[in-house]
């Protein structure tokens, strides 16, 4: 490719709405152009990166035995209604009507469609296993799209779906896909972690995220440096507290705490460690009738250590609670506690509530909580003596750095990550809902065992940039760079030898199958170098008249701060070595 024939559009400054480095650099390098909120044109330079990502993903999926297909972007609502996701997915699912008033959705994933395909065609266990995948445009109506391709509304995703005869075979398929994902991300040259995760709206009971490590990542990744344990914050656990609860050593006392409505303020006032305080969080669940009217409300009180935060995913799995819980209203809090938030506690309630105690609080003694009276707290609270032993104890908190790892092999650490892939074992969640069965060896109908596996094709380049950039621009890994080599001749219009040497090297690299671009735009050297450093092509060759007269050209890797001299006659062989050709 010659630069004069290509579409190169770089910017000196990033748009004002570009918040993170990848968004700024993708806009400045001309990889993407914004069309609307969370919707972007993939410009030629950016599309080359995306196509390389797709090619690697496609190669490894095919190698793993998956079969490519393509499913419609617009899907009938009836299929989504069969699984209940038409209502359950909420406003993120874009719903549309055709001219006849029929409901459709714009796909965010395709579990329903692929399950419908399989229930029509799979009749016998002899046809299994099967793994179908597509690389396709998706749409999710994000409330607040941001960070460019990191959290857009329209995006490209690789989604795969495995179908097996039983759980054992399904988990083999799951591991096969997880291994394929490791090969994919290894080929991209990215630093990543595979972490245990919650299945969320997809469903299922076995799930892992593949997280690219980056300081700007939206997700907190929890891991143990001295073991293999890793999970995202939603899923992460600490080792359960061990040993007997300490004996009570303080008397129960009502203590003035004027204007101190947080655990941190109370601890500072009383001169005690924050971890000896207990925070009270009040939730509510509503029972509704068929008309959607609330017929009964249950109020819940959650107790957590003052230095810990509630984990909503874990709370949603507490017996009796589910993901539909909400925070109680001020009126509901006053009705049950007779007090404003900030001074709440489990003692002296006006009305009974259901109590959920974090397992750390369950082993505490002499703790401090609200007195259910403004400007007062209770000190010296103890189980059994002041409160009945808790009936419902659960892990409902986020872990913190320094917690003991649940495998007992060290302490937990936390870093930030960008989710670029996710694998789920679904079981029969979708096949059962859609009655997708096959005849087993015993001749009886059985539900298909499923897994699903996603990779964010358009998110991956953004994640790669977050991990690979400097003050000059992007530093692409070779595998997904828009071009692998750029040749920069200096004023070739004035020096025929420079043009001839550049053309010769260009032809040699093309003949060797190298993705090379020759910058023949006639730009000044400074502007030319600035463009390619911004765009991030990994290997740059500069050919100038003075160097040729001395018998050399200059080579610079994008990560290097200075160029090195290479014998002009050996330039092609030198690059073959660098590119491992």
Curated annotation (Swiss-Prot):
Single GO cellular component term: cytosol
Locations listed in the record: Cytoplasm
UniProt keyword list: Aminoacyl-tRNA synthetase, ATP-binding, Cytoplasm, Ligase, Nucleotide-binding, Protein biosynthesis
Molecular function via GO: aminoacyl-tRNA deacylase activity; ATP binding; proline-tRNA ligase activity
One BP annotation, GO: prolyl-tRNA aminoacylation
SUPFAM superfamilies the record matches: Class II aaRS ABD-related (SSF52954), Class II aaRS and biotin synthetases (SSF55681), YbaK/ProRS associated domain (SSF55826)
EC numbers, comma separated: 6.1.1.15
Reactions it catalyzes: tRNA(Pro) + L-proline + ATP = L-prolyl-tRNA(Pro) + AMP + diphosphate
Parts of the chain that traverse the membrane: none
Entry keyword annotation includes Cytoplasm: yes
PROSITE patterns, per the entry: AA_TRNA_LIGASE_II
InterPro entries: aa-tRNA-synt_IIb, aa-tRNA-synth_II, aa-tRNA-synth_II/BPL/LPL, Anticodon-bd, Anticodon-bd_dom_sf, Pro-tRNA-ligase_IIa, Pro-tRNA-synth_IIa_bac-type, Pro-tRNA-Synthase_IIa_type1
Domain of life the protein comes from: Bacteria
UniProt-listed PANTHER family: MITOCHONDRIAL RIBOSOME PROTEIN L39/PROLYL-TRNA LIGASE FAMILY MEMBER (PTHR42753), PROLINE--TRNA LIGASE (PTHR42753:SF2)
Function: Catalyzes the attachment of proline to tRNA(Pro) in a two-step reaction: proline is first activated by ATP to form Pro-AMP and then transferred to the acceptor end of tRNA(Pro). As ProRS can inadvertently accommodate and process non-cognate amino acids such as alanine and cysteine, to avoid such errors it has two additional distinct editing activities against alanine. One activity is designated as 'pretransfer' editing and involves the tRNA(Pro)-independent hydrolysis of activated Ala-AMP.
Domain notes: Consists of three domains: the N-terminal catalytic domain, the editing domain and the C-terminal anticodon-binding domain.
Subunit annotation: Homodimer.
Protein family: Belongs to the class-II aminoacyl-tRNA synthetase family. ProS type 1 subfamily.
Name of the protein: Proline--tRNA ligase
Name of the gene: proS
